[in-house]
């Protein structure tokens, strides 16, 4: 494999080209990109965990250091002021010396408020991208040039097309997450609580709770019916029935986002349903290709859900077509088939149809779908179908003309298992689709 250093060199060249184009289009001289700042908890002197500006970590794999600044103009070597205070209270990261520092000019910034004297004197035509607009105003940036929508839309649109460096980082994040999923399954099989399973996951991935790209969803039994369950019970349930794990990892700022579901027993209806959802997920991925709308794949999976509901006699005496047409599949899969993935877990530009930011909303029937793009080479997306047994979504169907088609006895028997979700991360190539997750043999 080509070295990360050479891939990064090409990555920077791509970002420089995008920056030149954006600056020319919006008549700016340069962009000042801020890593961000620490913010204290209200009425406290303790800060919230630091989360870096994603537009900053697109350029440099510096994810844990606030008060850093990048100046980029698309022509000259990017200039990074790296926060390096004299501080005996807190850990201070050393000045970087890594595979990427040949391609960026790295300068120590000993005081957070010292950046003003180091920037070009003429700042009226510099754009600021960052989370602290008041800091930009203090530096003399024009208010109209603070997080300018046109520039951000342009950069966001092209972030959809990953460079080879970005794909290499995402494959490394996959490896970490796969290690975590294997450790978590083992912890589940040994009877651990959600809290302890989460610890096993973090240990295997080498992450802290604040390092993972999103809060791990570690859901035993009926908790799997809560789509974003993050409570983490300390006590294991008396009976282990099911385990849904939605958990990722991060490498150089790039995310993995995987989900697996396991049945405690291999010989019940739920275990067969898990297997069937997994098979249908793989079958859908096998059909994916560039040039097709992501929305089409979402709709196609509702047809596959209908097939499973019929096979398992959860819905009876109704055709699969009628199930989808009348949205009987909706309460069983209330979320979208997936989303773009990259520097952010729910990566940007899922609805953008061009580099001017033209927005195409999700279909009214499927409002929680997070992407309406035509798939193109370089895109990375999740494919994460599920079937759930959520009473608040099923309740409206207990009355009315379609109620008789629901096998309520079967649904009640499956509700204690919560639900099922299977999620892989795929890369769209010109003539193929790469499944980064399955390539690592995660069943």
UniProtKB/Swiss-Prot annotation:
Binding of Mn(2+) 2, residues: 246, 257, 423
Enzyme Commission number: 3.4.13.9
PROSITE patterns membership: PROLINE_PEPTIDASE (PS00491)
GO MF terms, alphabetically ordered: aminopeptidase activity; metal ion binding; metalloexopeptidase activity; phosphoric triester hydrolase activity; proline dipeptidase activity
GO BP term, pick one: proteolysis
CDD domains xrefs: Prolidase
Record's keyword annotation contains Protease: yes
Binding site for Mn(2+) 1: 257, 339, 384, 423
Keywords: Dipeptidase, Hydrolase, Manganese, Metal-binding, Metalloprotease, Protease
Catalytic activity: Xaa-L-Pro dipeptide + H2O = an L-alpha-amino acid + L-proline
EC class (word): hydrolase
SUPFAM superfamilies, per the entry: Creatinase/aminopeptidase
Pfam families from the UniProt entry: PepQ_N, Peptidase_M24
InterPro entries linked to this entry: Creatin/AminoP/Spt16_N, Creatinase/aminopeptidase-like, PepQ_N, Pept_M24, Peptidase_M24B_aminopep-P_CS, X-Pro_dipept-like, X_Pro_dipept
Necessary cofactors: Mn(2+)
Cellular component, GO, one term: cytosol
Cofactor annotation comment: Binds 2 manganese ions per subunit.
Free-text function comment from the UniProt entry: Splits dipeptides with a prolyl residue in the C-terminal position.
Stated family: Belongs to the peptidase M24B family. Bacterial-type prolidase subfamily.
Name of the protein described by the UniProt record: Xaa-Pro dipeptidase
Name of the gene encoding the protein in the UniProt record: pepQ
